[in-house]
Every structure is written in C-alpha cells, then in structure tokens.
Swiss-Prot record:
GO terms for molecular function: arginine-tRNA ligase activity; ATP binding. A motif ('HIGH' region) lies at residues 128-138. It catalyses: tRNA(Arg) + L-arginine + ATP = L-arginyl-tRNA(Arg) + AMP + diphosphate. InterPro entries: aa-tRNA-synth_I_CS (IPR001412), Arg-tRNA-ligase (IPR001278), Arg-tRNA-synth_N (IPR005148), Arg-tRNA-synth_N_sf (IPR036695), ArgRS_core (IPR035684), DALR_anticod-bd (IPR008909), Rossmann-like_a/b/a_fold (IPR014729), tRNAsynth_Ia_anticodon-bd (IPR009080). The keyword Aminoacyl-tRNA synthetase applies. This is Arginine--tRNA ligase. It comes from Coxiella burnetii (strain RSA 331 / Henzerling II). Keywords: Aminoacyl-tRNA synthetase, ATP-binding, Cytoplasm, Ligase, Nucleotide-binding, Protein biosynthesis. The gene is argS.
C-alpha cells in the first residue's frame, strides 16, 4: 500500500511541476509512515514540509495543492491535512485484506525484496582472538552480525560473511607459551605459569592432549628456561616484559619446528571449538580469513607500498610510521617496528585493503564498543590508501553483561574466570540467547537476565512469540479432529468478514512486515524486527483469547483460519531471520 501511495504522490508532484507550482528540477524524497493513531488515518507523509521551501509557500498551503493534484484511487477513502502540513491517508479495509492472500501465496518468501539486487556486501563480525572459548560478550556480536546478514540477504543484497582469525599476533605467542608451561607441569610441578599468561582449564586440556600425542618431545628443564630469561627483567615490576621473555625463551629452546607444532596444536584446538560453538549457535561464515595470509600473500607490503606512494609513510627511530595525524587521527601510528615486524595496525591496513580490492559495494565491520577509538584511524588509512571511506560502515556492539541473581559475572580471557557462550546457550537455550542478544539497539548496554530468558511466561518475549506460533499450530491440529474443513479459496473470498477491531489490528500489522524488513536491513537494526514480532504476537494472543476459530459459520471460519495462517507464516519468517526456531508445540 505504501508503494501505491508513493506512486500517487509522485504523480501529484509531476502535475504540480506542469502547473508551475514546483520547478522541474525538484526531486522529492517521499517518506511514508504508518500512523500511530487510527484517528489520523493509516499512513502519513511529511512531503509538503520538505518541499515547502522549494515551492516558496507554507507547508500547509503546499499540502493543499498536493492533495488537489492526487489522482483518484479505489483503495483510499479519505485524505486529510493535519498540523503544519502532514498529509494523512485513510485506506479501504479491502486494501488490508489483500495482504493475507499475498502472504499465503509467497509463503517463506513474503517480505523478501530486490531492494539491494546487484549489490555485494562484505561483513566481518565476531573475529575474537583464538586464545580461548567464546564468552557471552562475543555472543552478542555473533547474534547481531548473523541477523544483519540475514536481513540484508532478505533485502536482495549478496552478502559475504567473514571471520578474521588473528593467528599471527603477540597474544598467540602467549597462548602457545601457556600451553607449553602447562605441558611442562605434567613432568615438573615446580614450574610456574607466568602471572599474565592464559589461566583457563582449556589450556590444561590442550596441554594434556599434546603430552598424550608427543610425550616428552617438547620437554625442557626449569633451569634451561630460567637461563634464557634476562636477570634484569622483574616479573612483578614488569609482568608483560617478563611474559615476552618467556615467549622468546620458548622459541629458542623448542626451535622453529617444535614451536610451530605447539602453536598449531593450541590454535587448531581453540579455533575448532569456536567454529563448533558458532555453528551450534546458528552462526556460519563463507570464509575464515587468517591474519597469517596477509604476510604470506604480500598484502602487508602492498598496503605499505600504497601508503608510501601517497606520501603517508616516514621513518623514525628505525621504525616506519603512518602519518595518521594528516588524516584526522590523534597521533601517528607505527606500521613496521624497528625489529622489522609489522604491527597490528599494519595488519588492519592490509586486511581492509584486501576487502576493498574485492570490489564490494558495502563493507561492514562489527566491533565491540571498546574499539570505538579504531574508527578514525581506519577511516584515516583508507583515505591514505586512496579508498572511499564512505563504503565502510563500522557498527559498534556493546558487550552483554550477564547477571546471576544480582551478582555481575566478571569475564577475563587470560584469567580464565569467564562464562562461555556455550555455557550460556546450554543454560537458556539457543533461541532465548539469539533473541535476547538482539532485542535492544546494538549500541545500548544489555543486562542479560538469565531468569527471564528461562521463564515460560508472557514476560519472556521470545517465549511469547514462539507460543503464538505454537497456538496457531494447535488450532490447525484441533481442526483435524473435527468434522469441519478449511477451504482456503473460500476464505479468501470472505476476508471482508474480518471486521472486529482485533482482526483489523492484525491485518494492519501484517501489512507492515515488508516495510519492517527493509528498515531493519537498511539501518542494520534487527531489534526493529524483534519489536515487530512482539507486537504481532501480543495482538494475536489478544485475538485468540477473545474469539473462536473452529466455528460453525463456514465463511467466517475459513476467513479467520486464513488470517491466523498468515500470522503463523509471518512469525515463522521473522523468527527465521533472527535465527530463532518456530516450534509447533510448547
């Protein structure tokens, strides 16, 4: 219906151009919204307010001329001007009833569009360091990213989903060291794990698997290790330097081959766990892109060469620096350290250069909110590379805060005292986790209420939505136990019998679904769909409690069954996009 109103408004604008009311070069941006109060009609537009300056008249006067120029329509009963110049449209009941036939005809494809046809989108999300299991904070980024990708796909975009595997940085060296020390403890209990190494039980599990497979192949005595640690490094005064000294000692003692063996065992174990965890959560990827590929394929050097060519690289104190301050950053950034090794920043440059080189129309990075400081530096180096920063959309997600009772649960990957995503999923279920993670705006703090997520009541939004779907399924199961039938074509012929306020509300809400999908996709806002489904479920439950469906009146029964079948389809379609199941029984 919105498209039909937009067409009518465009025709009215063309008529006003012909009459000289508007100049030929005026290009209107027509925005049509559903009204919140039925007394103000079904749809409204602020078109007259946006064009009044170009027309040289008041918004109200222009609104009058637009209304006069509107072509007649059999689906609009009344048009009125409200306030300073809003135009309200009242539509016929028949225009809403046609939505039922559209839904039942399209089925699982209802709401999908070709809005983004021909446009390719690259999405990167989660990309947690493979140094430990995913925790509940990562889960929100996973659920959000997967939902945004689903919504963009439903809107016609071709979406490439990618996980960036940080397999080449300092943290990975610390991970390998942590596993090695736990491995050594299996032979020599006196050795202590450095304070800032990874402490979790999963490290012990990897070490035990290493010991079972390789025996004492990687064993070295405490004395040989201590001999490699410079005496001037104090583990208490500078724990990070002490940790780095241990990593260096490990590499020296093991040699390249054995170190790589320990390193790879740790990486493979944790990365496989992450992959399995996400897959069980319904979050899948088209590609797992390793950071090591950037070096292997010369992408870091390519990025460095391009920045140098554009005059943004200089040398200082033996290191190579990016002149970031010239492009809006607060300080210049090191690209290549004086020891010749690239920084994380250099890897970011190379990875984004790789993304842009693939020719995507949009590139979406989903980061934790603690990465907000990365935004100006990323946009800066994109300018330095000669790439269009406007193609990049950086979406920030606040970490979820888990509460067990009134106690906030702390999370620290190195310390090992964190609640994993898998533990959360096992406690509240995938469906509740997926829904709760996305029912708020991503940049809002989320206090994850475990007790609410597990409750079976109308206070639990995901349960209430799923229960609406299950209730509809129960109506059709009950139908099979009676002598009554469901004649869908006959129901279509009698949709005009759906005249109660409950039915009118449901019909109007069903008609909004395609618009909700488009808005949620274009604004990267799955919470809009979550809120829509809550509204639809609430309206259905009210209808279910007020009316009966398996009645004697054949015409009304078939019309009502068609209506609730359409509600069932929309709930299932919407939940699928959110990664939530639509159970038939509860």
């Amino acid at each position: 219906m919105k498209q039909q109103i937009e067409t009518l408004l465009n025709q009215a604008i063309e008529r006003l151009k012909t009459k000289g009311v508007l100049k030929p070069e005026v290009t209107p941006v027509i925005k049509i919204t559903h009204t919140t109060d039925p007394q103000h009609g079904d749809f409204a537009t602020n078109l007259a307010l946006t064009l009044s300056k170009a027309a040289g008249m008041s918004p109200h006067a222009l609104a009058e001329k637009i209304v006069e120029a509107l072509p007649p329509s059999g689906q609009i009963t009344e048009v009125e001007i409200a306030g300073p110049g809003f135009i309200n449209f009242f539509v016929t009941e028949g225009s809403y009833q046609t939505v039922v036939s559209s839904i039942l005809k399209a089925g699982k494809d209802y709401g999908r569009s070709e809005m983004g046809k021909g446009q390719r989108v690259h999405m990167e999300y989660v990309s947690a360091n493979p140094t430990g299991p995913l925790h509940v904070g990562h889960g929100r980024g996973a659920a959000y990213g997967a939902c945004v990708a689903n919504l963009l796909n439903a809107a016609g975009f071709e979406v490439h989903r990618e996980y960036y595997v940080n397999d080449a940085g300092r943290q990975m060296g610390i991970l390998a060291l942590s596993v090695w020390v736990r491995y050594l403890q299996g032979y020599e209990a006196s050795i202590e794990l450095p304070k800032n190494a990874y402490q979790g039980e999963y490290i012990i599990d990897i070490a035990e698997a290493l010991k079972a497979k390789y025996g004492k192949q990687f064993y070295h005595s405490v004395e040989s290790i201590q001999a490699k640690i410079p005496e001037e490094i104090d583990s208490n005064a500078d724990p990070e330097a002490y940790l780095d000294a241990w990593v260096t000692a490990q590499k020296d003692l093991l040699g390249p081959k054995d170190f790589e063996c320990v390193f790879q065992a740790a990486l493979d174990s944790i990365l496989n766990d992450i992959k399995n965890d996400l897959e069980e959560f319904g979050v899948t990827y088209d590609d797992w892109f390793p950071e090591s590929r950037l070096v292997r394929e010369g992408l870091i050097q390519e990025g460095l060469d391009l920045l140098t060519k554009h005059g943004y690289v200089y040398e200082k104190n033996g290191a190579q620096w990016f002149r970031a301050t010239a492009l809006g950053d607060e300080k210049d950034r090191v690209l290549i350290r004086k020891n010749g090794l690239p920084t994380y920043f250099a890897a970011d440059v190379a990875y984004h250069l790789h993304k842009f080189n693939q020719g995507y129309d949009q590139i979406i990075d989903i980061f934790g909110a603690d990465h907000h400081g990365y935004i100006p530096r990323i946009r800066g180096f994109l300018k330095g590379l000669g790439k269009a920063p406007e193609k990049l959309h950086i979406l920030l997600v606040q970490f979820a805060i888990l509460y067990r009772g009134n106690e906030k649960v702390s999370m620290s990957t190195r310390g090992g005292t964190f609640v994993t995503l898998r533990e959360l999923r096992h406690e509240v279920g995938n469906d509740a986790a997926r829904f709760f993670y996305i029912m708020r705006k991503p940049d809002q703090h989320l206090d994850f209420d475990l007790e609410l997520a597990k409750s079976q009541s109308n206070e639990n939004p995901v349960y209430y939505i799923q229960y609406a779907h299950a209730r509809i399924c129960s109506v059709f199961r009950q139908l099979k136990t009676t002598q009554k039938n469901w004649d869908r074509p006959r129901g279509m012929e009698n949709l005009s019998l759906l005249s109660t306020n409950y039915e009118k509300e449901l019909l109007a809400t069903l008609g909004r679904y395609p618009e909700v999908i488009k808005r949620a996709a274009m604004n990267y806002a799955p919470h809009l769909l979550a809120h829509y489904l809550q509204t639809l479920a609430n309206q259905f439950h009210t209808y279910y409690n007020a009316e009966r469906f398996l009645i004697e009146d054949d015409n009304l029964r078939n019309a009502r069954l068609n209506l609730i079948n359409a509600v069932q389809q929309i709930i299932r379609n919407g939940l699928t996009l959110l990664g939530v199941s639509a159970p038939e029984e509860m």
